[in-house]
Amino acid sequence: MTHITRLEAPWFLRASKKEYKWTVRASPGPHPLGKSIPLGLLLRDYLAFTSSLKESKKIISDGKVLVDGRVRRDYKYPVGLMDVIAIPHADLYLRIVPDRARLLKPVKISEEESKFKLVRLLNKTLVKGGLLQFNLEDGRNLLISKESTEMFKLPTLTTLKISIPNQEILGVYGFKENVYVMAVGGKNAGIIGQLKRIQTSPYKTRRYSIVVIRSPDGSEYETNLENAMVIGEEKPEVKVE
């Protein structure tokens, strides 16, 4: 199905329910329908880079828009958390980050920052040859050699800093006190601050532990560990506001 009614569309999309009956349905891809923005709508409704969907389709089909360093020609392609969008001919570079009001929003970044992204490790799988496969939140998979013993020990939900599109691991950020974290889901999505403590329970798995985030104004917020993402140690590694 190419389109859905605006009433059926994810609640956070910037789409007037009174202007048109139909809107774009995101294609199957690295992000689920309920956590992504179709690329064509991003250009028109979020960036005002185009004035119509037809214009968005033309620019995208001409190969002028890159997502995570690769040309995407599908105007329905789903972009989601921490994806990097580049429109080089317009000198425009963006990152998709959580938004307190609308779940997701684009923020402008520098060309230098567009060369890498942060992504969470969702799970690990042993594959043929004794290699370890990292399955990441944006749908990509990384093969880790047997010699990388420290990588084998990484817990799930660890944040990896990777180059794009080459997928070289540039940094690893785990959960510990005073690292910078961002709430990426739940009612506090978009909150950014330092991790003050993790409250665990013997009756729940690790991912349902409670993370306490202290924002710059001193307020404290709680969210599940699975709704939190480490974005840096001494400072955020990426621009998120």
From Swiss-Prot:
GO terms for biological process, alphabetical: translation
InterPro entries linked to this entry: Rib_uL2_dom2, Ribosomal_eS4, Ribosomal_eS4_central_region, Ribosomal_eS4_central_sf, Ribosomal_eS4_KOW, Ribosomal_eS4_N, S4_RNA-bd, S4_RNA-bd_sf
GO function terms (MF aspect): rRNA binding; structural constituent of ribosome
PROSITE patterns attached to this UniProt entry: S4
Domain of life assignment: Archaea
Keywords: Ribonucleoprotein, Ribosomal protein, RNA-binding, rRNA-binding
Record's signal peptide: none
Domain S4 RNA-binding: 37-99
One GO cellular component term noted in the UniProt record for this chain: cytosolic small ribosomal subunit
Similarity remark: Belongs to the eukaryotic ribosomal protein eS4 family.
Stated name of the protein: Small ribosomal subunit protein eS4
Organism from which the protein derives: Metallosphaera sedula (strain ATCC 51363 / DSM 5348 / JCM 9185 / NBRC 15509 / TH2)
Taxonomy of the source species: Archaea, Thermoproteota, Thermoprotei, Sulfolobales, Sulfolobaceae
